UniProtKB/Swiss-Prot annotation:
GO terms for cellular component: cytosol. Residues 1-20 are annotated as: Disordered. GO terms for molecular function: 4 iron, 4 sulfur cluster binding; ATP binding; ATP-dependent FeS chaperone activity; iron-sulfur cluster binding; metal ion binding. The gene is NBP35. It comes from Cryptococcus neoformans var. neoformans serotype D (strain JEC21 / ATCC MYA-565) (Filobasidiella neoformans). It comes from the Eukaryota. The keyword GTP-binding does not apply. Heterotetramer of 2 NBP35 and 2 CFD1 chains. Keywords: 4Fe-4S, ATP-binding, Cytoplasm, Iron, Iron-sulfur, Metal-binding, Nucleotide-binding. The keyword NADP does not apply. One of its GO terms (biological process) is iron-sulfur cluster assembly. This is Cytosolic Fe-S cluster assembly factor NBP35. Belongs to the Mrp/NBP35 ATP-binding proteins family. NUBP1/NBP35 subfamily.
């Protein structure tokens, strides 16, 4: 089954409140691929609008402040820290790092943490957190997230798909509408940290989360890369994106930084940092290297099983790296 541009059908276990719909109808059926949506201030003016039969109608339509922004601001007021996890390229372990970071935060029972998965077309967080069979329910106060732990809430489009193999093929406005609902309609409760897992690159999802969270406050972004120059090159673009939209950069994380033998614990290089890796790039650009997470094959195994690698293998150098990174992030945010 393929999810298309039609309004998204929620599985039957998830009743919706009468006042809410899953996706707003903000894009005409015959709109171009990158339509900004009829409610956008760029409606009828963006480059994507050229040649669209609706261009003049959209350009002349009434524009005003987004009425949902105050609702988002109110909902997010109960979230103390909001952290984006970004990567310039897919396959560097961004979602795996998001899961590890969240497990590490939630290891403190006094800490309330949450994951918002806005990788709309490739949601892997449900699998990584052991929540593939979870469904979302709604109440008068909004959608209830799934819980990996009592103090670790998770929301993902993966919970709304009939099958984990279903493709999501949506234009930008449809994705934006769902992200907005994750922000304003999910009953997150009081959180100390919200970790936002984003798609690779700089896409509609990134622009949406920045736009919607701007007033509520984004505390910063963690950029994940591997040691190779092909990954670092795209991280430079991600850094440029953060600077242009005003997102503070908390620091870099070099993932798959060497290989740790599960038996002898010795570490060896697999992906050689031919240009110095994240450490050299951080020094060049004045961005802190938060840490290096070595490649432990047991990380992949625990991810497939939806288990916390940190709990299962506390003696691993990778676990130590995660805990050090979390400690450094806390120090940076507490100093602000």
């Amino acid at each position: 089954m393929i999810a298309t541009q039609r309004p998204f059908p929620i599985p039957s276990p998830v009743p919706l409140a009468p006042s809410s719909t899953v996706l707003p109808t903000t894009v005409p059926e015959n709109a171009p691929e990158h339509c900004p949506g009829v409610e956008s201030s760029q409606a009828g003016k963006a480059d994507a609008c050229e040649g669209c039969p609706n261009q003049s109608v959209c350009a002349e339509g009434p524009k005003g402040p987004d009425p949902d922004l105050p609702l988002i601001r109110e909902r997010m007021s109960s979230v103390r820290r909001k952290i984006l996890v970004l990567s310039g390229k897919g396959g560097v372990g961004k979602s795996t790092f998001t899961a590890g970071l969240s497990w590490a935060l939630a290891a403190d029972e006094e800490c309330q943490a949450g994951i918002m998965d806005i990788d709309i077309c490739g949601p892997s967080i449900p699998l990584l957190m052991g929540l593939e069979s979870s469904t979302i329910h709604t109440s008068a106060s909004g959608w209830s997230p799934a819980y990996a732990l009592d103090n670790l809430a998770v929301m993902s489009i993966g919970f709304l798909l009939p099958s984990s193999s279903d493709a999501v093929i949506w234009r930008g406005p449809k994705k934006n509408g769902l992200i907005k609902q994750f922000l304003k309609d999910v009953e997150w409760g009081d959180l100390d940290y919200m970790v936002v897992d984003t798609p690779p690159g700089t896409s509609d999802e990134h622009l949406s989360i920045v736009q919607y969270l701007k007033e509520a406050g984004i505390d910063g972004a963690v950029l994940v890369t591997t040691p190779q120059e092909v990954a670092l090159q795209d991280v430079r673009k991600e850094i440029d994106f953060c600077k242009k939209v005003g997102i503070p950069i908390l620091g870099l994380v070099e993932n798959m930084s060497g290989f740790v033998c599960p038996n002898c614990k010795n570490e060896s290089q697999i992906f050689a940092p031919t240009t110095g890796g994240a450490e050299a790039m951080g020094k060049e650009l004045g961005i802190e290297l938060l840490g290096k997470v070595p490649l432990d094959p047991r990380i992949g195994m625990t991810c497939d099983q939806g288990m916390s690698f940190l709990d299962e293998y506390p003696e691993s150098p990778a676990t130590m790296a995660y805990l050090d990174i979390v400690q450094r992030i806390r120090e940076i945010l507490d100093d602000e």
